[in-house]
Amino acid sequence: MKVSYHGHSVVKIETNGKVILIDPFLTGNSKTDLKAEDVKVDAILLSHGHGDHVGDTVELAKKNNAVVVAPFELATFLSWQGVNTHPMHIGGSHEFDFGKVKFTQAFHGSSYIDEENKTITYTGMPAGILFTAEEKTVYHAGDTALFSDMKLIGELNNIDVAFLPIGDNFTMGPEDAVLAAKWVQAKTVVPIHYNTFPVIEQDPYQFVEKLQNCTGKVLEAGESITL
């Protein structure tokens, strides 16, 4: 399994001949190395409905005939836009032909904001994502605060790599993320959701230096690890 980081919270997983994208915010993302028009994808996993996570989902899904796996309300909202969706919810898991997906808790918001009409559409609960294939497990925490049930996520799952937000302001910051890393017990921890906007500027190298009992790894856009 090859797992690569592409700026902000964008993660790509390549396994068994399939390509999976998590939170494909590409257009307008100054930190990504990907262009939506060049991306080929079989499945898209979404943690929640904010624009910097849904991103280019509709365009990518339609162009590639990709399935979008998302919390129920968000999946329903996207299905109304002509997207092939598979709705799930927190605590639920499903075995797909590309791997197993399970949604976990995350403490954040989830909505679609229409700036032009000044409306906000509720898109369900935010989630974290556990993805398992080839006997390897990836945990993408989505946007979240620190919460104590991360201990359960670590106890119940043998996590090979965890992608944790460190940007602060909208999510947990580096100090809380260090504790999150301890609780989820991943072998490798990669920081995400930082430096895309001024309000979430952080030094990822300082973060990984503080990690204990795991390998911290800063991935620049386009860099990958093999599990």
Swiss-Prot record:
Protein name: UPF0173 metal-dependent hydrolase BALH_4194
Keywords in alphabetical order: Hydrolase
Keyword Hydrolase: yes
Pfam families associated with the record: Lactamase_B_2
UniProt cross-references to InterPro entries, sorted A to Z: Metallo-B-lactamas, RibonucZ/Hydroxyglut_hydro, UPF0173, UPF0173_UPF0282_UlaG_hydrolase
Protein family: Belongs to the UPF0173 family.
Record has Hydrolase as a keyword: yes
MF terms in GO: hydrolase activity
Chain segments annotated as coiled-coil in the UniProt record: none
Superkingdom classification of source: Bacteria
Entry-linked PANTHER family: UPF0173 METAL-DEPENDENT HYDROLASE MJ1163, UPF0173 METAL-DEPENDENT HYDROLASE MJ1163-RELATED
